[in-house]
Amino acid sequence: MRNFTFYSPTFFAFGKDTEKDAGKYVRRFGGTKVLIHYGGGSVVRSGLLDRVKASLEEEGLPYVVLGGVKPNPRSGLVYEGIDLCRKEGVDFVLAVGGGSTIDSSKAIAAGTVYDGDFWDFYSGKPITEALPVGTILTIAAAGSEGSPDSVITNENGMFKRGASGDAIRPRFSILNPALTQTLPPYQTACGVTDIMAHLYERYLTNTRDVEVTDRLIEALLLTMIHEGPRVIENPDDYEARANIMWAGMMAHNNSCGVGRT
């Protein structure tokens, strides 16, 4: 096993109806005005956006909203979010969605407090400062809810780059497996596949004697093998979705990758 450091300070609230406490967590982590960032209409149609707004209002927290995040989040919406945050005096970014929404939120959070072009961070500049970010996860897949990573597509050339830094690691993440029960089977299956890919990326290593992380990865892979078909057969199976959601976080917060290369 190689030397390593491990830092994973995200606060997690896991379980049914936990999104109703979003306002409490925003205030706990220093937010006074919030950007609610989300993707498509499902967040609106399901009533989730209204519940999030109500939670913020209960805490007396003003907010602005910015929807429209697409898969492989685009730089154009990040610039729009940065401008909105600066104009409105936003000091906390709340992502409501999956990995693309969370990655876009992280980019907005970093860009808002930076004098230059946020794309500098996706060209190698270290991220040392950002607005705090919180998440409400709606699909178990990317693992961005517990990681310091973000990937954005630059629309000037349509290429993707990543950035990473503890400043953009979510301060809190709300994980309610019930929010994933309305996902189509295809998206659910893609999420399971994404989680397994993250695990294989860490499992395949030349580092010897990493028994703890070997066994941890194997346990998570077995969980995916067991729970994936189960949740496709019964999309309302809360327990299967709960296991998948927590495994997705563990697969990408690097607890499985320490001490190995």
Describe the role of every protein-language-model region.
Residues 1-92:
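ATP/NTP phosphate-donor binding region
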Residues 11, 33-35, 63-64, 91-94, ...:
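Structural motif
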Residues 51-52, 80-82, 101-114, 146-149:
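Short Gly/Thr/Asp-enriched flexible loops that form oxyanion-binding sites at enzyme active sites
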Residues 70, 96-98, 259-261:
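Active-site nucleophile and cofactor-binding loops and adjacent substrate-binding regions
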Residues 90-108, 138-144:
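Glycine/serine-rich anion-binding loops at beta->alpha junctions
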Residues 113-209:
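A glycine/threonine-rich phosphate-anchoring loop and its flanking beta-alpha core
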Residues 202, 206-261:
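Active-site segments that bind and position negatively charged phosphate/pyrophosphate groups
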